[in-house]
């Protein structure tokens, strides 16, 4: 995979695929600008090298039609503020008017194009849409790890039509961190997998058995595993069609002498509500009609001990419904343990990234990934289409 350090950029027009798919508040303001900040090292590097910079991104799911609420104009404004000079926003992403504006760029100047997904061709990996984007540049840079698991025109097809294509700093760093944490880790390697559904993490669970020394399972998905071991989990969320699969994973871990750790106690509630009645119970004593919404304190302590023994930690998925105060302690205990561990720690994006930020320990992790789906894709042992396209 070629990187930006291997390319001469002076006076060349560069199209950089970034991920500015930003969370917005109810007033249309950016709620979190971390994804913009993550691209600043690359943007500043290209400015210093005298490139003419065209930034391209999607935002949300407009389904091939323009939607004012999903415009990237606020991203251009915020990037201008962070850089200290104007980033020009163009209200389209392909066509003669866009090409004309790009041709007017001077070295060190930046344009941000409008939302790529305002055209159906982006998500369809349409070669004609990709060709139209490629006509805007001499060099293509992919710095959008978080969408590199998608076969999109600006991620995959575009590489067939540009003279030079390479990875940006963020994509390069993400791929390297993944390699160092899973494909070539310092052992013991402990994977912590949580979240709601076994079905969404099944590929990751099965692939992790090929790499880990210990596998810690929390979140609502643990209910399916607990049921597979003969526990009655009351009204807790269980994927009945995957109970047998969960039992197979537990047995597979035993056969491979992998320490698979399940909860021993749970925080249960009489309903799914922040104001619900709650109790801490043993996994064998969940009351009928009650549901598990977090791991219990004894489980948190057991998980923490396993984490402390690790030399490498990979964490994807919260331990409970951490957005509700009564059910956030399990995630907090795990976050604190990972932060305190003398280990190389990589945290998957999405909810887990949000959780470590809320717990105030993001800066104690070795790396917090910018990608949820892309990170999971790698955990499943799959190649990223966006990375393969650069080879």
Swiss-Prot record:
Molecular-function GO terms, alphabetical: ADP binding; ATP binding; phosphoglycerate kinase activity
Q: What class of enzyme is it?
A: transferase
GO CC entries: cytosol
Does Transmembrane helix appear among the keywords?
no
UniProt keywords (A-Z) are: ATP-binding, Cytoplasm, Glycolysis, Kinase, Nucleotide-binding, Transferase
Protein family membership: Belongs to the phosphoglycerate kinase family.
Q: What is this protein called?
A: Phosphoglycerate kinase
Gene symbol of the encoding locus: pgk
């Amino acid at each position: 995979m070629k990187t930006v350090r291997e390319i001469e950029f002076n006076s060349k027009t560069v199209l950089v695929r970034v991920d500015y798919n930003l969370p917005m508040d109810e007033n249309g303001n950016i709620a979190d600008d971390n994804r913009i900040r993550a691209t600043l090292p690359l943007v500043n590097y290209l400015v210093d090298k005298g490139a003419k910079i065209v930034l391209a991104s999607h935002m949300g799911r407009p389904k091939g039609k323009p939607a004012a609420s999903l415009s990237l104009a606020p991203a251009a404004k915020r990037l201008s503020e962070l850089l200290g000079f104007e980033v020009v926003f163009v209200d389209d992403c392909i066509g003669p008017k866009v090409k004309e504006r790009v041709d007017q760029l001077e070295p060190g100047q930046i344009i941000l194009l409008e939302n790529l997904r305002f055209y159906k061709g982006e998500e369809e990996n349409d070669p004609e849409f990709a060709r139209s984007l490629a006509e805007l540049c001499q060099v293509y840079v992919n710095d959008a790890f978080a969408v590199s698991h998608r076969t999109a025109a600006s991620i995959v097809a575009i590489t067939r039509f540009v003279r030079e294509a390479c990875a940006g700093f963020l994509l390069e760093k993400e791929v390297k961190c993944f390699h160092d944490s899973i494909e070539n880790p310092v052992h013991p390697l402990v994977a912590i997998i949580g979240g709601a559904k076994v079905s969404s993490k099944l590929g990751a669970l099965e692939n992790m058995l090929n790499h880990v020394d210990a596998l810690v399972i929390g979140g609502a998905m643990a209910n399916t595993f607990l049921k597979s071991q003969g526990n009655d989990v009351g009204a807790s969320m269980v994927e009945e069609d995957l109970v047998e699969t969960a039992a197979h994973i537990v047995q597979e871990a035993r056969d491979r002498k992998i320490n698979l750790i399940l909860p021993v106690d749970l925080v249960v509630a009489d309903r799914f509500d922040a104001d619900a009645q709650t109790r801490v119970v043993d996994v064998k004593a969940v009351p009928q009609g009650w549901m598990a919404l977090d791991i219990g304190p004894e489980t948190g302590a057991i998980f923490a001990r396993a984490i402390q023994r690790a030399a490498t930690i990979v964490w994807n998925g919260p331990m409970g419904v951490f957005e509700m105060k009564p059910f956030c302690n399990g995630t907090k205990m795990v976050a604190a343990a990972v932060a305190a561990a003398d280990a190389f720690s990589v945290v998957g994006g999405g909810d887990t990234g949000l959780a470590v930020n809320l717990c105030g320990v993001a800066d104690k992790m070795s790396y917090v990934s910018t990608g949820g789906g892309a990170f999971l894709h790698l955990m499943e042992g799959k190649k990223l289409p966006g990375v393969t396209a650069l080879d």
